[in-house]
Regions:
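Compact, charge-rich alpha-helical regulatory domains located at protein termini
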Residues: 1-34, 39
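Gly-rich Lys/Arg/Thr-decorated short loops/hinges at beta-loop-alpha junctions or inter-strand turns
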Residues: 92-104, 122-127, 152-153, 175-183, ...
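Conserved internal helical-beta-strand scaffold that buttresses enzyme catalytic cores
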Residues: 97, 109-111, 115-118, 122-129, ...
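Short loop-beta-helix segment that forms the pyridoxal 5′-phosphate
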Residues: 102-106, 123-142
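Active-site C-terminal subdomain of aminotransferase-like
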Residues: 268-380
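Conserved C-terminal alpha-helix-loop-beta "cap" of PLP-dependent enzymes
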Residues: 350-445
């Protein structure tokens, strides 16, 4: 395809068509203080590639990188060790096929790995079936809500207070364009989940109850109790898993009554990636497969009787009129799904359980040590690799001070819930296998120094 640059007349016609006078009008939403004025500081107007690289490296050293500091951030995105073999294998030629595997004859590598990925997710979630992935955990959560509405023919979804606020926000944004009614709220700083409070919101209009497992505070809700109550009122239970490594140790949601299980697959194979791309996981009961969004890869045989893989049941999604489709999502996070599948394969079932046990033991060590810091209260007794501590002052300021001292010490609830003053002192701490006992000790001693007002 030829590249034909625009002429001044072309630009003028395009601006007139959208009602803009000049190019700068397209950037009015960017705050004035964020726009570049004049030359880039430290660089001349013309600079060589080497000079620009040197300048960028110098700027990057001002950042506190995840690999260079004790790292206890979580709340939906987790730092795990990803074996080098994952990045090596995803670059193999078998997977470097065209974007969409519509021609199975030339995309067997991609299709087979997606088939295996679906199998891994279904086994992990305890569901009958899983799709070939969605964009990320939050959009998968919304897709589960509207899927439940189609199945039950109801439009009220109860979002448990422990559901990640970003997932709630995504659902609220999408619900502006549908008839779905969402009930949600902020969590309380209680040690245990209040399942009875969730159940009290279920009525005959409820399509589904959405429960994070473990929740945003690290607590582990009683899914079976909520599932039984939801089913009694003709509603479905949607379980949301933001940390899939937890399922190496705790019971799969599908085994506890969840009808639809969704989640974020970033923890396995993908990495933090500055917040994306990530990987939406989606599983459900087989009887709901026709209402499930996204792609499905199936196993078949070719004309010679050899095993092969194809996209199947496509008529429920992209090969159909828009108003009849199950979703507006007609793609999947294929590369991230491949990385997830390779990492899972390298671990195996026993490896995943071992990894989960290491995470849990490190979290227990951290909770014990942080609980010894004067003024700190560990909120929850039951958790996987993430728990909440309550500080004597605003956690946002404490986190800022910790970062200045070289420790990335958790996610403040005040950042996640800026309008909830009662949560301001809460700090969510995630502890994975990358957190060494030395890191935990550094975190505890630094936190103690910050709270006692000691100079850095």
């Amino acid at each position: 395809m030829r590249y034909l640059p625009l002429t001044d007349d072309n630009r003028r016609e395009m601006l007139e068509a959208i009602g803009a006078r000049e190019i700068d009008d397209l950037f009015v939403d960017v705050p004035a203080e964020a726009r570049l004025k004049g030359d880039i500081e430290g660089l001349p107007k013309q600079a060589s590639e080497m000079a620009v690289e040197k300048h960028m490296r110098r700027l990057s050293k001002k950042n506190l990188a995840a690999n260079d500091a004790p790292f206890f951030l979580g709340a939906g995105a987790y730092r795990h060790h990803v074996p080098a073999s994952v990045d090596h294998l995803i670059q193999r030629g078998e997977f470097l096929t065209a974007y969409t595997p519509y021609q199975p004859e030339i995309a067997q590598g991609t299709l087979q790995v997606l088939f295996e990925f679906q199998t891994q997710v279904a086994r992990m979630f305890g569901t009958d079936i899983a799709n070939a992935s969605l964009y990320d955990g939050s959009t998968a959560c919304w897709e589960a809500i509207v899927m439940a509405g189609r199945i039950t023919r109801k439009s009220r979804a109860v979002l448990a207070h422990g559901l990640h606020p970003h997932y709630v926000s995504t659902a609220q944004t999408m619900a502006k364009f549908t008839k779905d009614e969402l009930f949600s709220g902020a969590p309380d700083l209680d040690a245990d989940c209040d399942e009875d409070a969730i159940i009290a919101q279920i009525d005959d209009r409820t399509s589904c109850v959405v429960v994070q497992y473990p929740d945003i505070l690290g607590r582990i809700p009683d899914l079976q109790k909520i599932a039984d109550a939801a089913h009694d009122r003709g509603a479905l239970l949607v379980a949301v898993v933001t940390e899939p490594v937890a399922l190496g140790l705790i019971e799969a949601p599908g085994a506890l009554g969840a009808d639809i299980v969704v989640g974020e697959g970033q923890s396995l194979g993908v990495g933090l990636n500055f917040g994306g791309p990530y990987l939406g996981l989606f599983g459900c009961r087989e009887k709901f497969v026709r209402q499930m969004p996204g792609r499905l890869c199936g196993e078949t045989v070719d004309a010679d009787g050899k095993r092969g893989f194809v996209l199947t049941l496509s008529t429920r999604e992209q090969h159909i009129r828009r108003e009849k489709a199950t979703s507006n999502i007609c793609t999947n996070s294929g590369l991230c799904a491949l990385a997830f599948s390779i990492h899972m394969t390298l671990l195996g079932g026993a490896g995943l359980e071992k990894l989960a046990r290491i995470n849990h033991s490190r979290a227990r060590l951290a909770a014990q040590r942080l609980g010894e810091v004067k003024g700190v209260r560990v909120l929850n007794d039951a958790y996987f690799n993430e728990f909440t501590i309550v500080l004597p002052s605003d956690a946002r300021e404490v986190v800022r001070e910790l970062a200045e001292r070289g420790v990335l010490g958790g996610v403040s609830l005040g950042r996640l819930y800026p309008d909830e003053e009662a949560l301001a002192n809460g700090l969510v701490v995630a502890v994975t296998e990358t957190c060494t006992p030395e890191d935990i000790e550094t975190f505890a001693t630094t936190l103690s120094a910050v709270l006692e007002g000691e100079a850095a």
